Amino acid sequence: FFAAADAMIAYAEANNIKVIGHVLLWHEQTPDWVFLDDKGQTASKELVLSRLKNHINAVMGRYKGRIHGWDAVNEALNEDGTLRQSKWYKALGEDYIATVFELAHQADPKAQLYYNDFNLFKPEKRAGVLKLVAALKAKNAPIYGIGEQGHYSLDYPKLQDVEDSIVAFKNTGLKVVITELDISALPFPDPENIGADISLNMKLKQEFNPYADGLPKAVSDQLTQKYLQLFELFLRHSDAVERVTLWGVNDNQTWRNNWPMKG
């Protein structure tokens, strides 16, 4: 089960590369059995909490001292900034996020812990993160930084909106990490759902795949310019932005080739 991760971490250590863990808790891709008891009924809060603790201890314990930081909780907010009513929320209550940070810190006290989410350039969601961070800090939860996902396109978001979020998060006293940075050159088929909700699964329409034979130079230049503008922004706030993580080795292997429609 751990063979691939073991090999990647060994490679990183041999080449003096820091490793970031993703992710300890996420509402997506959690097996249904986690929330059921041995009779197939809704599991008790105590049972779900025990499973969560065992999971965190198993994963973080295996790599204790070897993984620099972890996305402790991923995408726990709705687009309006309210807490997502996920199975984790329903099983453990609204304090479950603080619990994850506490359990993770116990498992590896030296690991940096982040809250990670997408569309944080939107004012409503940004406000939700600020409210969440304030609540976590009030509970003395060991949160180190805020992960601002970067699933962008050529025409969104506005750079000013990204900068406003960086400044707002910096003012909390936490560090900012730019995570999952990729920029799509393709038109987005559903403007109302721009972001990174992996549950979107739309039927392929060729009008949204205009560059099947290769990216025209003019569009490639636009893509280059967008990356340049973003990195200039990150450098302006290098006192707070500690890391930028690119989401994929190259554009040919990006997850966005198969989301929100496969093609």
Model segments located where?
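Short amphipathic alpha-helices and their capping/turn segments at secondary-structure boundaries
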Residues: 2-16, 56-64, 102, 130-136, ...
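Substrate-binding cleft and catalytic face of glycoside hydrolase catalytic domains
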Residues: 3-120, 187
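Structural preference for beta-strand elements that scaffold enzyme active sites
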Residues: 18-20, 67-71, 110-114, 142-147, ...
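Aromatic-rich peripheral "rim/lid" segments of glycoside hydrolase catalytic domains that contact
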Residues: 62, 71, 76-94, 99, ...
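Short, hinge-like loop/turn segments at secondary-structure boundaries
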Residues: 37-40, 131-132, 194-197, 202
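Distinct, well-ordered alpha-helical segments
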Residues: 33, 82-85, 122-139, 158-166
